[in-house]
């Protein structure tokens, strides 16, 4: 088992994943997301890559109350994706809510990165 990432490392990982998710959201559309299994899997993987560090920051209480409130739901997403419970994952919502979720969750991330 590897070492736990530091707060700064987790913030950087989340920021990098958010940038990749935003880039993918600009390249795809609902039709591609619906018809392309590989694209859909890539988006789910990037969601997991984004949600994991945010969830770790929340669980380990490495961030304040405002960030914990903003990111609390990311742990549910991480748990669903990490345990591959496909029947519980609303893949369409992962795509449809991508811009809104990034807009809501990136603000605390940007503030914390600026303070690091």
What are the functions of these language-model segments?
Residues 1-116:
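Solvent-exposed interaction patches of small proteins and small membrane subunits
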């Amino acid at each position: 088992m590897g070492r736990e990432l530091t707060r700064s490392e987790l913030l950087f990982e989340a920021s990098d994943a958010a940038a990749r998710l935003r880039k993918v959201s600009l390249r795809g559309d609902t039709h591609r997301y619906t018809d392309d299994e590989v694209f859909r899997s890539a988006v789910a993987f990037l969601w997991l890559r984004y949600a994991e560090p945010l969830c770790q920051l929340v669980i380990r209480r490495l961030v304040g109350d405002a960030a914990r409130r903003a990111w609390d739901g990311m742990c549910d997403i991480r748990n669903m994706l990490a345990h591959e419970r496909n029947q519980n994952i609303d893949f369409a919502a992962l795509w449809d809510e991508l811009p809104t979720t990034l807009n809501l969750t990136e603000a605390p991330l940007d503030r914390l990165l600026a303070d690091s």
